[in-house]
Amino acid sequence: MSVLLIAEHNNKELKSFTLNAVTAASQIDTDLHALVIGNNCGDAAKAASELPLVKKVITVEAAHYENFLAENFSPVVTKLADNYSHIVCSANTFGKNLMPRVAAKLDTSQVSDIIKVESTDTFVRPIYAGNAFATVKSTDAKKCITIRPTSFEPCESSGGSAPIETAEAGEEFLLTKFVKREEVKSDRPELGTARIVVSGGRGMQSGDNFKLITSIADKLNAAIGASRAAVDAGYISNDHQVGQTGKVVVPDLYIAVGISGAIQHLAGMKESKVIVAINKDGEAPIFSVADYGLEADLFEALPQFLEELNKLNTIQK
């Protein structure tokens, strides 16, 4: 049977992680269908149809799908589920909210946060904050799976021409009401998809000292991250948190400043292509995953680093 991928979008365009999820889903079965639920989401459906790995797009539109509530989405998914052996979406906030509800309604066990597809019924997922990996075999006839997007390359975004079909919308779930959405507006790259991330930890000592991180991030056109310790201390807002309970990032360059390297933080960044650590404690666990380490006082090292960047007189693009 086919694989149903629940596409994430903003009613106008696909979210970037959907491309990673498509790659993963196509490794389960090449007969891959994308489900686009929303309101006036024709552009997103068209974008999904242009993905070469997608064989068919199913779109469901109604005003009560505007804000992507799992309570409204899940009946649509379960109604279509009979035609599919696997139901897949990203293991981000969207997927973690939706998929448990879908799995419960289908009376099946969810396989969460997979990083590798071994076969149609066997998958690899991290456990113990990424310090070990479990190979999981699902014997359920219908499998509900969430995928860690950063573990898979994004698929090609053009060249396909999948047909678009329309399915009937369900009734609105009235016990849950959308109140509002507050989005953080920034000129910086989005943390989850940035090529360069500069993160600060408890060693920054205060929120004001994060201005050092900001100055360097400005020169590198980088996203700003933080450890949970820095967030809990109130140095920076939690939308910057990297780690097991924050965002998982896989940038080309990750600069960790004043971060000791608790396993929860390492779980969110240790797959970065190049890791640079700056910490005055030479025994800090962060050095165990770093490609380059500088044992130094960050309040001396960062101004020197910024001075050298200023000499280049350029901002990375």
For each predicted feature, which ranges?
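N-terminal glycine-rich FAD/FM-binding segment characteristic of electron-transfer flavoproteins
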Residues: 1-317
